[in-house]
Amino acid sequence: MIKKIGVLTSGGDAPGMNAAIRGVVRAALSEGLEVCGIYDGYLGLYEDRMINLDRYSVSDMINRGGTFLGSARFPEFRNEDVRSVAIENMKKRGIDALVVIGGDGSYMGAKRLTEMGFPCIGLPGTIDNDVAGTDYTIGYFTALETVVEAIDRLRDTSSSHQRISIVEVMGRYCGDLTLAAAIAGGCEFIVLPEIPYTREELVNEIKAGIAKGKKHAIVAITEHICDINELAKYIEQETKRETRATVLGHIQRGGAPVAYDRILASRMGAYSIELLLQGYGGRCVGIQNEKMVHHDIIDAIENMKRPFKGDWLDTAKKLY
């Protein structure tokens, strides 16, 4: 019988994490459960830095970006002895189960705790939208708005100077954020990790656009594919057009969550409590066709693959 749960945020922060914490806390309290917040993710779990939360602890949190509990990367959590300390810390505080909000790296920690007999539920919190088993992750839609706004601003100055602009978008090894932002921002060219790319092919496409009369262009590219400053130099050399590179960086993680992220986070937070009360552990929450779903967390990490939105890319190419 679960009487008290813990909640933490782990990995890179994402807008809507506070709304998810709020959803967990208030749904748990409505069921008569106690809630303990863990500071700085798995690091705080290991260092026994926790605080009891009530409904007022999460007042005015639904609209705040970031995570008030904090987050930290803690690779030492792979060590079983470290995890044993974390479990003992939770047990001495009377915590019976844990809700983990984060990406697939955070899920791995939850999986390992579950394998050691401590029930965990994972909520997908990352702007990258790269977690399997869910159509969307908490923070993705807010980051999308941020990226599109940046592209709109770049278009203004690119048009004024008849310039080629390259914008690097987060996403790690998933192109969802780049692809959606490129369509919404009207980008002329898109470079994604899912599609083989050569800079020669990109330059040929840009030259073809110039031949059609394009005065300026925006290239959206997912991070980790190449050095975009070097790419900008190469494009300028080959096209004789001024080319500038912009790395959006961590501004994509900040800001108040948009309405959909607040709703998604609230629904997922409340659903995690339903699952725990039904006796589930080692599960991760997702949304598919606007319905809450749950999967084995091992499947989400190791076996399930996110489908690539090839039809979206086809649409984008028609609009170049």
UniProtKB/Swiss-Prot annotation:
Gene Ontology process terms (BP): canonical glycolysis; fructose 1,6-bisphosphate metabolic process; fructose 6-phosphate metabolic process
Reactions listed under catalytic activity: beta-D-fructose 6-phosphate + ATP = beta-D-fructose 1,6-bisphosphate + ADP + H(+)
Known cofactor(s): Mg(2+)
Positions contributing to ATP binding: 12, 73-74, 103-106
Active site as annotated: 128
Enzyme Commission code(s) on record: 2.7.1.11
GO CC terms: 6-phosphofructokinase complex
Coiled-coil region list: none
Family label: Belongs to the phosphofructokinase type A (PFKA) family. ATP-dependent PFK group I subfamily. Prokaryotic clade 'B1' sub-subfamily.
Protein name as it appears in the record: ATP-dependent 6-phosphofructokinase
